[in-house]
Curated annotation (Swiss-Prot):
Keyword flag Transmembrane helix: yes
GO annotations of cellular component type: plasma membrane
Chief site of localization: membrane
Name of the protein this chain belongs to: Inner membrane protein YbcI
Ranges of the Cytoplasmic topological domain: 1-12, 78-83, 171-173
Species name: Escherichia coli (strain K12)
Length: 173
């Protein structure tokens, strides 16, 4: 998986690129939270749930069903708070949440992503894995491998995100 901070890159770059008239700050904040939400499944380790279990890491919280239903619930509960239209809220939140499993699918480790849950327990990777998988232990980020993880995230997520943000910003000017 990319680091939890890097999962925020997609909604952050899209939201800032489109500007606060299109993506109000509250909606941007919710998008960032939803982009990080699927990794709450690591808490299942504390309860003895195995990594490869459907309720383990990269299981149902990384599924397409989760990525489409959770934003829908958020929109119905908080649409007025987001200060944006129903469809805009749902689209932004869905892209934000879906980006999480897409980024996880291009990492060099793990057991894949449970995109098709509840129809299948099979895990998937994208055809290419370019992002170094992030270690769970914070202490590992000070090692040479941790530095490689940070560099790969900068190169494959943050740099393209910043370019997209710049193009969106330039287009609206």
């Amino acid at each position: 998986m990319p680091t939890v901070i890097t999962h925020a890159a997609v909604p952050l770059c899209i939201g800032l690129g489109l500007g606060s008239k299109v993506i109000p700050p509250r909606l941007l904040f919710a998008g960032i939270i939803l982009a990080m939400l699927p990794d709450a499944d690591v808490l299942s380790f504390k309860f003895g749930v195995a990594y490869g279990n459907v309720f383990g890491h990269r299981g149902f919280t990384h599924s397409l069903v989760f990525a489409f239903v959770v934003p829908l619930l958020c929109v119905f509960i908080g649409r007025r708070w987001f200060r944006a239209g129903l469809i805009r809220c749902w689209l932004f939140l869905t892209v934000s949440l879906l980006s999480h499993s897409l980024l996880d699918s291009v990492t060099t480790g793990g057991k894949g992503v449970g995109w098709l849950w509840p129809w299948s327990d099979e895990r998937f990777f994208a055809p290419w894995q370019v992002i170094k998988v992030a270690p769970f232990a914070l202490s590992r980020y000070t090692t040479p491998y941790g530095h490689q993880v940070i560099i790969s995230e900068l190169m494959w997520v943050w740099l393209p995100g910043m370019l997209l943000m710049g193009m969106l910003w330039w287009r609206r000017r």
